[in-house]
Amino acid sequence: MMLKSLTMENVKVVTGEIEKLRERIEKVKETLDLIPKEIEELERELERVRQEIAKKEDELIAVAREIRHKEHEFTEVKQKIAYHRKYLERADSPREYERLLQERQKLIERAYKLSEEIYELRRKYEALREEEEKLHQKEDEIEEKIHKLKKEYRALLNELKGLIEELNRKAREIIEKYGL
């Protein structure tokens, strides 16, 4: 096997190639060190968002329960109003009529108040649903970021493996070529 002479020009070329590989390896390693930290931060944020979602779901359940309760109460009040109307028609005395009329008026006021409360509760429910939907979107975005970072991490690991193999190959070539 004939050995090529190791000239200064050859040394510069080989050293330059090796230095480029080493620099790229260092950059890849630095990025590889950062990605797990980013993923960890995103996973903490994801956990926080999921806790907020659970809290919103609990609030939604409570508001829905309150709406059902108020609607049930509203139905009962409406039935009592209808019941009082029948009794007003049968009132025996002005005093009884006045008493039934006052009771009916209180029931009408209660029904009106309940309808306002139901309306406000439904608005609150819709606002909570919108907040929950935004949180679900945020959850999806964070999960997508985590997925991309993990994919990038795997790609960088493969690149690092390739760079190390390339560096080793170049070292073997130099040893074989120049008989070192």
Swiss-Prot record:
Q: Does the keyword Coiled coil apply?
A: yes
Q: Which Gene3D superfamilies does this chain map to?
A: 1.10.287.1490
UniProt keywords (A-Z) are: Coiled coil
Residue runs in coiled coils: 3-82, 95-179
What is the protein's name according to its record?
Uncharacterized protein aq_1476
